[in-house]
Structure formats: structure tokens, C-alpha cells
Amino acid sequence: WSAGTKYGAPDNRTIIRFGEPFTLMSNRSADPANVQFSLPTMYHSHFWTAAFADLNYGKAAEAEQSGAFKAVTEAADKWVRMGVDGFRLDAVKHIYHNAYNDENPTFLKKFYDRMNESYKAAGGEGDFYMVGEMLDEADKAAPYYRGLPALFEFTFWYKLKWALQNGIGCYFVKDILDVQPLYAQYRSDYIEATKLSNHDEDRTGSDLGQSAEKMKVA
């Protein structure tokens, strides 16, 4: 910490409360463990598994009533009021514990609808854009179109990578077209957000053997 400060408090009765200022202690011997947080279990959800959710929104069907949902949307509203007309959502399958039941799509629809309302109230034209990163094959990602208008197309990249690595392109178009009816089951106006690799995967250049020709085709 600058000027030798660190988090600390005079004793363990000191509580940090939302919206109230807290002064950093300049004494290096101050014990950080003395600092308590008011209502620490309101937002955080502890599953204690290898993959657990970050925030406790309660039941997905009632998520909008939770303090966590209200805090997140209020923070997002500030960006909308400043002119932002879309969000990219990371790791949308990890909001609730089970990535493959209806909880995450249910939550995402509530979040999207709420932000779309804010966008229109701020004078936005058309609909708010929101794209989710659902890192999985098309059949697993498709149900997430119930909640979001756009999803990153991991299957597109998987099929394209295979075609370029093997020099076989005769299946590519069919493979991509075959997944579209699947998406349409969940959303008629779905948006396939085309991508190559991202930060969670080996990069495109590495997957394609640093071939400039293949990278240009991709």
C-alpha cells in the first residue's frame, strides 16, 4: 500500500458497511483480520465445489428480488447511462452451479430484459446488445438463447479449425448450417457471434501451426 498503509482496524468491533467511508489504517501492525463486513452472506454463495457460483442471487425464478441482482444491475445502469449499448458476459454457464439446467438461461433473461429496459429508458435505439460466452458445443450452448440474444460461436471455431488443420473443407458449411435449427428452437432472432479462439483456448496461430495462409483463411 502507498505510504505504508494497509487495511486494518483498531479492534474487532470495527465493521465495514456499504456506503459508509472507511479509513485505511497507517499502522502496519494493524490486524486485517479485525475488519468485519456487514451482512457478508447476502451476496456470496458458497458451494465449496471445484466450480462454484460467485454471487448468491437466490432462486433463479426470483433472482430479480435478491440484493445481489439489484446491486449488479444498478452498477450496470451507470454504464448504460454513459452511452454503452451492449455487454459481453463472461462465463455465463457459471452463474448458477449447474450449467445445463434452466437456471442460468432463466437468470440471463431477467438480466437482459432489465438492461434492455434501462437502455430504452436512457434513449437507446433498437434493443440492447448482449453476447454471452458459453464455452461448449452447440447442443449445450443452444438453450442459453432463451436468455440472451447472442452467444459466441465456439462450435464454428471447432469446425473451422478441424477443416483447416486437415485440409478438408467439404463438411464445414453443412456443419455450421446444421446447428442453426437447434438455435432457432430457443430464439427465432438468435445472433451467432462468430469468433476464432479466445483467451480460454490455445490461440488461433498456435492451433494452425503459425501458418500465415491458414490464418488468413480463418
Kindly label every feature range from the protein language model.
Residues 59-60, 204-207:
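Surface-exposed cleft-lining segments at the edges of enzyme active sites
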Residues 1-70:
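Glycan-binding loop/region signatures in secreted carbohydrate-active enzymes
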Residues 1-25, 74-77, 85-195, 206, ...:
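Active-site-proximal helices and loops of the catalytic beta/alpha 8
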Residues 62-82, 212-218:
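Short, acidic/polar
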